[in-house]
A protein has these predicted regions:
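A short beta-strand-loop structural module common to alpha/beta enzyme folds
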Residues: 22-40
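A generic "cationic amphipathic patch" detector
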Residues: 16-19, 30, 68-70, 129
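Class I S-adenosyl-L-methionine
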Residues: 6-7, 35-36, 40-55, 61-144
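S-adenosyl-L-methionine
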Residues: 1-27
Length: 144
């Protein structure tokens, strides 16, 4: 069984999957992945449709985070040392976060895996932009 781990970061999913005998291909920009590239630049069609049985994606949550609202009224280098406005945050989400999410969905659509997971904090805004069917799963609902 093959797993594609997008935005692999600490490889927490991939490590466990490998221990269980799964073949894992990881993608991230951190230099520790099997494929080190910006997901927006990845030519995923080098793999055939259906190649991966499972896709696990943990897209960056920072552009969708409600915590960013605490930046309003502050000067931040990320925004060019100008005072941050709500409009700037919304524009950043649409210009940075949403394209990454759309590419993730495009990849999932292409591979059409048996299972796919898109992990992101429940309090963030990513769920407002997801176009694929999804279930909201929270480990707290299971007693953890």
């Amino acid at each position: 069984m093959r797993i594609l781990e997008l935005f692999s970061g600490t490889h927490s999913v991939g490590k466990v999957a490998k221990e269980l005998g799964y073949e894992v291909l990881s993608l991230d920009m951190d230099g520790n992945a099997d494929i080190n590239i910006d997901i927006l630049d990845w030519d995923y069609k080098q793999y055939p449709v259906g190649y991966f049985d499972i896709v696990w994606a943990s897209p960056p949550c920072n552009t969708f985070s409600n915590l960013r609202r605490s930046w309003i009224g502050r000067k931040l280098k990320y925004f060019g040392d100008v005072i941050v406005t709500a409009e700037m945050l919304d524009n950043d989400m649409m210009q940075v976060g949403v394209p990454i999410l759309r590419k993730t969905e495009e990849i999932i659509n292409y591979f059409n895996p048996d299972l796919y997971f898109m992990e992101n904090p429940k309090t963030g805004k990513m769920k407002d932009f997801v176009t694929r069917p999804f279930y909201d799963v929270d480990y707290c609902a299971y007693g953890f």
